[in-house]
Amino acid sequence: MEIPVPVQPSWLRRASAPLPGFSAPGRLFDQRFGEGLLEAELASLCPAAIAPYYLRAPSVALPTAQVSTDSGYFSVLLDVKHFLPEEISVKVVDDHVEVHARHEERPDEHGFIAREFHRRYRLPPGVDPAAVTSALSPEGVLSIQATPASAQAQLPSPPAAK
């Protein structure tokens, strides 16, 4: 069963390097789609004596995916600032939430770029697939949430019309 979930317009810090003086060139859950390497990642290839001269302090923290499944609740935050709302689709397929975003080649400050990504998240047991909602913040953070089926059953039903 496939259920489309509309994306409605409506901080996260990159993990630190595993060892001092070492900068890993990216992690599995980093959501920096098509942004290239950081200066710190390039500087890790330089000798330690000259690397500090090439580094600038980061002005903003880089976002990562943040997934939470506490107590059967499901929540995902993704940075999709490089995509327009109509370029993003969120749908529920069986017990998974699938996120797809794509934009055609367009100019940027370095030339031209095209981006595309797919993410698939398994819903935890007890979460109602029909309760999945998504919203896009003005800053470009996609929020996907769902509550346990038991929490849906406890919600009061609207009064019947007379």
Swiss-Prot record:
Disulfide bonds: none annotated. It is found in: Cytoplasm; Nucleus; Secreted. One of its GO terms (biological process) is negative regulation of cardiac muscle cell apoptotic process. Belongs to the small heat shock protein (HSP20) family. Keywords: Chaperone, Cytoplasm, Nucleus, Phosphoprotein, Secreted, Stress response. It comes from Mus musculus (Mouse). PANTHER family: HEAT SHOCK PROTEIN BETA-6, HEAT SHOCK PROTEIN HSP-12.2-RELATED. The modification Deamidated glutamine is found at Q66. The keyword Chaperone applies. SUPFAM superfamilies: HSP20-like chaperones. This is Heat shock protein beta-6.
